[in-house]
Amino acid sequence: MEKVGFLGACDKNSLLMYVAKALTAMQKKVLVVDSTIEQKTRYILPAINPTKSYLIEFDKIDFSVGFHNLEDICEYLGVKDKSFSQINEAANEGILKQVQSNNMVENLPYDFVLINVDSPEGIEDFGIEDAYRNYFVTTFDMYSLKKGIDILFGIQNPLKVTKVLYNFDMKNENEEYLDYLSVDCKTIWNDTSVYLPRTVEDEEVIEENQRVFKIRIKKLSAEYQEGIMYIAQDILNEGSISKIRKSIKE
């Protein structure tokens, strides 16, 4: 099981759904965790008698809402620490609990867990600094930028992060401004950024998908699809974008 963090203040729900869809097309089992304050997943995906925290399966993807950490999800799913009996009972109690917690999380029945985080607390609660990959997703309105930077200040140790940037015209000065705002953060930006269009046409497709309860990538613009497939390929760390593209169309 590999954790993948998606950090930022802008709406990332649809992006995570599409990335998860691309990963499942490659025969991977995926859990999408909505740890955000607004918990928009509650209102986007259909659920029967939803409780304060719950997990649902939708379009071959599992989605969780309302959990405070991955350990809570483990308890919800009945995942146990299979190696707990092998741990020295004389060990420090705190270390014992941490080892047990880590082992439980490792036993989650997924290839990838995509975690949507919009607060500094979420970084700590979900152990984002230990994630296999991390992405910072933002638009260039001042709220998303500055709130996003506040979230990044929750990172306590140097951490490699890939920028995922929504913008109409991809102006260089926008990305330079983000670099300026984040200069005191612990982030180490990866050399390659992902650029996603934010066109009226793409927004209409996303809204239509939500109305009909579908996760369809095909109708999105070619540029948006390429961004999704690039992220999926980066997470998979294997194969090629063309292979993912073919799997999505099947």
Describe each model-derived feature in a short phrase.
Residues 168-222:
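Beta-strand-loop-alpha "switch" segments that mediate conformational coupling across diverse proteins
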Residues 104-124:
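Glycine-rich phosphate-binding loop used to anchor ATP phosphates in small-molecule kinases
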Residues 42, 143-153, 204-206:
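Short, charged, surface-exposed secondary-structure boundary motifs
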Residues 120-141:
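Inter-motif core of Ras-like GTPase G domains
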Residues 206-250:
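NTP-binding/hydrolysis catalytic cores, primarily Walker-type P-loop NTPases
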Residues 5-10, 31-111:
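P-loop/Walker-type NTP enzyme "switch/lid" segment
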Residues 6-8, 33-34, 113-116, 134-140, ...:
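Conserved beta-strand segments of the P-loop GTPase G domain that flank and frequently precede/overlap
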Residues 1-25:
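Glycine-rich P-loop/Walker A and Walker A-like loops and their local beta1-loop-alpha1 context
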